[in-house]
Structures are given as structure tokens and as C-alpha cells.
């Protein structure tokens, strides 16, 4: 397992990390806490994974408690990432929540500090290695108090690196662009980026290169929600609680057709491993967070760090296929975020952040 660094922070992480949303939310099948802890320990002990990405909203703190159980006696050997911003403490909102709908978000300094203290308690630690604001939207990007709070938490030693996680849809282009313009000392951005879903991630990378010299990226949904694992067919039926069950059938059919164009990537590695190597070819990618939900996947994806890099010809062919949408004609992607540059008039009409 190779490692990369968040520049200027002292934080070094494995090229392949482990995102705990597959273990703690039930959206990828149910896992007991004992099963989750066993997988986390195997990731570290057997495969050299050192970066573990949680969020307070994953299972209402469950992912953080799983980390504390798995690594409580060896805290200094692993790197914890977590995310804040959803008000998981609002009982009324929790009871009214339906399915995977979003909880209310809060980014005022007092709430952020409260959320961090609760994360520290659940993680059973006195510092967080990487803290990101979870699914920030444009009003939060434009709230300087939120980012000053992140810097203050860093000075106080409660966090070592800070940034933002964009989603849950793959949009949010100008949220990220404006963030690196406004806060050029930001350490990291978490975003969706993969061979099949290159936009808007590529544009986010270009913005960081232009404005934020030390901003690196931790990548989630590395396999296009499983499509790049190369295991699905047009007849696949996802389990009842699997979030992909609720996607339109065209997502599955078109995805399978796109994947069939990528056989040339599997001459020296599995498609899943080659998909991670495609990401790792970008120097600003500090770590990848594939969705891991069984031991076989864990072994396959962790081995991707040592898999042969893609050749220049393979990289060129992927780029050419992407320009042609992998030979598939489909409706344009719809996004939840800001995919056009807001004008000054738009900004004036936008909701303003709450007072601290």
C-alpha cells in the first residue's frame, strides 16, 4: 500500500481508504457492528489501509463509534476523517425524515463546535485528522464564519486538516469553484469522480490548480455506484434496502453498456483496480474511497495501490471514450448543485447564512 500526503498538515494516508457509509447506514445491505469492526481491522491489519472516512450523519454517529471500537487502542496508527453539518440532534427532524431525505443543515460556529465535540466523544479521541463540512451548498460556501471556525479548530489542535465534501448528487460545480477562490488555503475537497462520471470533478480539479495550491482531493463513488466493478448485467436486481434499487432502469442499462467499452483496461488488473489507478494518475488525488461491502472487495480494491499504473495509451482511450459518452446516447445528466456561474444579482437574492 502506497501513501500520499495532505500538503502542509503532516497527515499521510493510504492511497486506498475505507468509507464507512457502507458499514453504518444500511444503504448497501445491513452489517452488524461486530461485522463492521472486523472488516475495519482486516483493512488495516491485512491490507495496510490507514485512512477511514466517517460522518456524524452516517447512522447518526454509528460510523464514528465503529471506528472507536476498531482502533481505540491504536489511535496514532490510523487516520480519521469525519464530516459535520447535518443536525442529527434535532429529534423532530429525525422523526419526520423519510428514506434518504436530507436532515436540516447548520454551519453556524456554535453548532459546528458542538458537532465537533460530539464527534470527538464518539471517536474517543482528542483530535480529528481530516474534518470536512458535509454537502455544503452555496450559502454555506459564502459564509466566512464557517471557514474561520475550521481554521480556529486547527489552531486549537482539534483538527489537523479541513475542507468540504460535495454532494450528494455529482453536481455542485460552482460551489467548489467558489470555495477554492474564496478560501485558497483549504486542505481538501471530497467529491464524486470516476471514469464514467468525469464532470464536474475534472472542472473542480482545474479550479483547485488555479486557486488553491495545496488543496488535494479525496474521491468517493470511485466506481460509479458499483458500475465499474464490472459485475452487473441488465438483469441485475438490487436488494430492497440498496439505494440503487430506486434509480431508473436506464441508469443500469446504460451503465452496463458503457462498461463493455472498457475491456482494454483489464489486461493487467481487474476493472475495479484499473478504475482506482485511473484516479491515482491524478497527482492531486490523495486517496480513494471505494464502496467496500465485503471481504473480497476489500482485498481487490486495497491491492489496487500496487497494481500497474494505466499506460498512456489506456489513459488516452478513456479520455476519447468519455468525449463520446462511451458510445451511449442518453438524456443529459441532471444536477442538484450550481452548474452555472451565479451572477452578482443571483448572489444578492441568495439566502444569507444565519447569524452565529
Task: Walk through the language-model features, giving the residues of each.
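Active-site groove signature of glycoside hydrolases
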Residues: 120-139
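Alpha-helix N-cap and loop-to-helix initiation/capping positions
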Residues: 28-35, 62, 66, 100-111, ...
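N-terminal binding-site loop/beta-alpha segment at the start of enzyme catalytic domains
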Residues: 1-79
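N-terminal small/glycine-rich loop or linker at the start of catalytic domains
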Residues: 9-28, 81-103, 130
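Conserved, mostly hydrophobic/aromatic
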Residues: 6, 18, 36, 52, ...
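Beta/alpha (TIM)-barrel catalytic core signal, keyed to glycine-rich beta->alpha loops juxtaposed to Asp/Glu
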Residues: 3, 135-329, 339-356
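Short, acidic/polar
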Residues: 30-43, 105-123, 170-179, 275
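Acidic (Asp/Glu)-rich catalytic clusters
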Residues: 8-10, 69-76, 120-124, 151-155, ...
